[in-house]
């Protein structure tokens, strides 16, 4: 019986929720910087019988039989990622970016070793030393921030803290920073104190693959990333390195140190994603992602809203609402009512709690996949400001929602109207 089961017939409640989410994605504008729309080919790979196969170990060195075909799948993903990023070593087994980071900690550090990373309210990630995360609970985490007034990474502070605390590992990377990171400066600082340099490029991996953002691979000892976001693949993770000196440690940290069997259907989807990213049109897409972000930033700033660091050189921006005396939670709700999805986000020295915040983060990967150009991105930024200026006024929200519905029909996600 199970061979013929369909979700619609067997589990209509689940089917209804899934269908509703498909409708939401088609009819709402997605501006969460970490979200994107993957291709039908990526989704097709994830929905195959590869999901049935257990394959502990690595290609050619498995603990289970019957892995000759999944070995081909995983090796394809590895080889394509190496070509895409110019890395000598790649591990495509991490289930997420956080698990990739966790594996690097396990490979390179001992418990209570000192790590230096960007603080959450400056734009860092939980796994960069936040006190509520494994990286802050199990290690001595020291945090750097931004230059007050400019919103740029305070490299002098990074250097000063590195000299003072002698970290075993320095983490460069971010989840809410809109400028270009100076990877070479981080390398210099790491070398000064004899630290490993880990770069978490999760947010900008697609931009790097597309040649519109500098690559950290020549500078870092280890690079981690997710494979969704700007890379437009499945929700998963990956580890890269510039040479194979650390390969054995990293492989052992992923399996058996941090995970059991890899998700072969997801690894197949990564292989598809990397092949897509090697195409010439992927570069054009990434160029448009940045153009759209800059078009939005200009309108938002012209309308009187502050963007931390004064603009954007990548796919995202962090908007401070302190001057407007509104919270990120309010803005998130008001824009959501207009069918524009963003996320509330802390700003530097945020007086509000992480559940409320004083800012919102927006990004352009998803709208660019959808087909937005600079003019349409600028219009969208204006609609956002209209809703915020009105503090969620029902009439203004309804007017903007109508505009959102119209452009969503004009630019469907998967070339079909729901």
Curated annotation (Swiss-Prot):
Q: What is its main location?
A: cytoplasm
Q: What PROSITE patterns does the record tag this protein with?
A: SHMT
Cofactor dependence: pyridoxal 5'-phosphate
Gene Ontology terms: biological process: glycine biosynthetic process from serine; tetrahydrofolate interconversion
Q: In this UniProt entry, which residues are annotated as the site Plays an important role in substrate specificity?
A: 228
Q: Which E.C. number(s) belong to this protein? A: 2.1.2.1
Entry-linked InterPro entries: PyrdxlP-dep_Trfase, PyrdxlP-dep_Trfase_major, PyrdxlP-dep_Trfase_small, Ser_HO-MeTrfase, Ser_HO-MeTrfase-like, Ser_HO-MeTrfase_PLP_BS, SHMT-like_dom
Q: Where in the cell is it found?
A: Cytoplasm
Q: What is a GO molecular function of this protein? A: pyridoxal phosphate binding
Pathway noted in the entry:
One-carbon metabolism; tetrahydrofolate interconversion; Amino-acid biosynthesis; glycine biosynthesis; glycine from L-serine: step 1/1
Q: Which domain of life is it from?
A: Bacteria
Q: Which SUPFAM superfamilies match?
A: PLP-dependent transferases
Q: Which CDD domains does UniProt cross-reference here? A: SHMT
Its signal peptide is none
- Family according to the record: Belongs to the SHMT family.
In its UniProt entry, what is this protein called?
Serine hydroxymethyltransferase
Protein species of origin:
Psychrobacter cryohalolentis (strain ATCC BAA-1226 / DSM 17306 / VKM B-2378 / K5)
